[in-house]
UniProtKB/Swiss-Prot annotation:
CDD domains in the cross-refs: Terminator_NusB
Keyword Transcription appears in the UniProt entry: yes
PANTHER family in UniProt: ANTITERMINATION NUSB DOMAIN-CONTAINING PROTEIN, N UTILIZATION SUBSTANCE PROTEIN B-RELATED
Gene name linked to the record: nusB
Record has Transcription regulation as a keyword: yes
UniProt organism field: Nostoc punctiforme (strain ATCC 29133 / PCC 73102)
Protein name: Transcription antitermination protein NusB
Superkingdom classification of source: Bacteria
């Protein structure tokens, strides 16, 4: 695996800490470097912990429903198929949780680079501030790009990935193709099985709408 660039590390820190940091940009902008790093890392840990716990709870729920269906059925084909589907959902949820836990091995690198590389922490801060300052505009762009869906109904990490990508494209001058590719890579690490395809599709529609606006 190739070493990740400072901006890639910054995006990951911003993604994992976005929902945990102060919404008021002024509060974040006044933090000293060591305070900023501490808040970024703590926010990342809390987000990842919450995501893994929720995913495992979903897996446990699907397993229980599958088990209940098997115990109460009379081995009808429809019941067996339903139980099989629930079991597959549980396996998928468990795999997602395992993948999310696997990213924890990168935390020492995140912490070290955030401490040593000013560019990492500054870009992470810029991303969080830009999203919070322009959240209404960003969410409007996403709402028009979502098909039969609402921004508020998206999974937290999916929503944050999309918001960061749109912030980069619209406000930070990042080329659309780079912002989309980086968002897709984040989705592969932190979203569900088809999350990266969903993220890619939404962001492609955002760029198409920008061209016709």
């Amino acid at each position: 695996m190739q070493p990740r660039k400072p901006q890639q590390i910054a995006r990951e820190l911003a993604l994992l800490s976005l929902s945990q940091l102060p919404v008021n940009p002024k509060k974040l902008d006044t933090l000293l470097d060591d305070q900023l790093v501490s808040k970024l890392v703590l926010g990342a840990v809390r987000t990842l912990t919450s995501e893994v716990q929720d995913t495992l709870n979903n897996a446990a729920g699907e397993l229980q429903r599958s088990n209940d269906r098997l115990l109460s059925s009379q081995t009808r084909a429809s019941d067996l198929n339903s139980a099989r589907t629930m079991l597959q959902e549980a396996i998928a949820c468990t795999q997602t949780a395992i993948n999310q836990l696997g990213t924890a091995v990168d935390f020492p690198e995140l912490i070290q680079l955030a401490n040593q590389d000013k560019g990492v922490r500054n870009y992470a801060k810029e991303l969080v501030i830009t999203v919070n300052e322009n959240r209404h505009i960003i969410d409007e762009l996403l709402s028009t790009a979502l098909v039969d869906w609402q921004v508020t109904r998206l999974a937290q990490l999916d929503r944050d990935i999309l918001q960061i990508a749109v912030a980069e494209m619209k406000f930070l001058g990042v080329p659309d193709s780079i912002a989309i590719n980086e968002a897709v890579e984040l989705a592969k690490r932190y979203s569900g099985d088809d999350g990266h395809r969903f993220i890619n599709g939404v962001l492609r529609r955002v760029t198409e709408q920008k061209k016709t606006a």
